[in-house]
Amino acid sequence: FVLNYHPENPAEEIFRSYQEYEKKFGEPHQKEWVAHSNSLDESRRLKVGYVSPDFRSHSCTYFMEPLLSHHDHGKVDVYAYADLTQEDAVTARYKGYVEHWIPTRGMSDAALAQRIRADGIDILVDLAGHTSGNRLGVFARKPAPVSLSWMGYGYTTGLRAIDYYLTDEASAPQGSEHLFSEEPWRLKDTPYAVYRPGPGMGEVNPLPALERGYITLGTLTRGVRVNHRTIKVWSDILKRLPTAHIVIDSASFKDPTVQQAAIDKFEAHGIDKSRLHIGYNSPPWDVLRGIDIGLDCFPHNSGTTLFETLYMGLPYVTLAGRPSVGRIGSAILHGLGREQWIASSEQEYVDKVVELASDTAALAQLRASLRQQMQGSKLMD
């Protein structure tokens, strides 16, 4: 999990660690791969099972719910294998989208794999990858004839037992197949995920720079994504925009010690702390109301917060990097039809942010129209 955030390691080196994971935790279970007896009758409904610890109030809801709520139940019989410590109101909604709700907390991987096989699942979907609460040990036993990983993690699982990694051309371009244990299944003419905003985000406000007289840049990302490379690039931008401020706001920066460590790194590049606003405020969309231009991180891009950034009327600039966690920002912008905000180098990233900041009238127009554009785009279809 953490290796994906390494600012220097090349993609091939990181993938080798996934191959080691397969040797230790995947290959020992290949003896449990046995032929499946699923009916080949094309007239019957397909049994599709989703395995997740996040059928609750969680950022994954913004992407899982649009899919689960739109299944054609005349063609698909939906199973949810829910590994939850507690349920909430969102859980209740999920239960309404599926025919079969199976709590799996406390069930061993072997027992759950046996249950999935007994249920006759045709397609089994992993929604967690290597995140907390995953059941990759179940997938290693290949309890369904077809399995795939999607969305919750953002990269390969390393398991050869999983057949496909559901993605798109922008996230996993042609030629990147050697970086996945699964076969990349690229959605055509649509992004890898669509977004349904959460409640309470409110309306888009006018561009803050019009009132303040200076540009505010910002990110809502976790601290693990903010490394020495991003700080240098953001410092270079602040040098090019001498009146601009930057907001770095997430739960990672609640601790004053962490805040000061980030300030020290910017000051080492000659940026005065009076231009830095580092901390944690909630809800995040209220923070976005005070920002003019969003900044994506690299080499591991942000995720949900990029959708929120656009939805609140802010353009953002991203650096396209290694598949696929380094191309999340690019995939989202491709879905929006705003490829001009994708940089291919750190210098181009700086230039694109400076270019956006140089035209406040255009930024104000973007602020007023971007949500409507997003709602009519593939990102929310």
Which residue stretches match the model-derived regions?
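Substrate-binding clefts and catalytic carboxylate motifs of secreted carbohydrate-active enzymes
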Residues: 218-229
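Short acidic/histidine- and often glycine-rich active-site loop of Leloir-type glycosyltransferases
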Residues: 326-337
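Short hydrophobic beta-strand element within catalytic cores of glycosyltransferases
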Residues: 315-324
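Short hydrophobic "strand-cap" motifs at the C-terminus of beta-strands
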Residues: 51, 220-222, 249, 279
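Alpha-helical solenoid repeat scaffolds of the TPR/TPR-like class and their adjacent stem/linker regions
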Residues: 1-214, 232, 264-271, 282-293, ...
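Residues at the starts of beta-strands that form the adenosine-phosphate
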Residues: 77, 243-245
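Glycosyltransferase donor-sugar binding loop
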Residues: 82-86, 245-260
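Short alpha-helix at the nucleotide-sugar/activated-sugar donor binding site of glycosyltransferases
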Residues: 309-311, 334
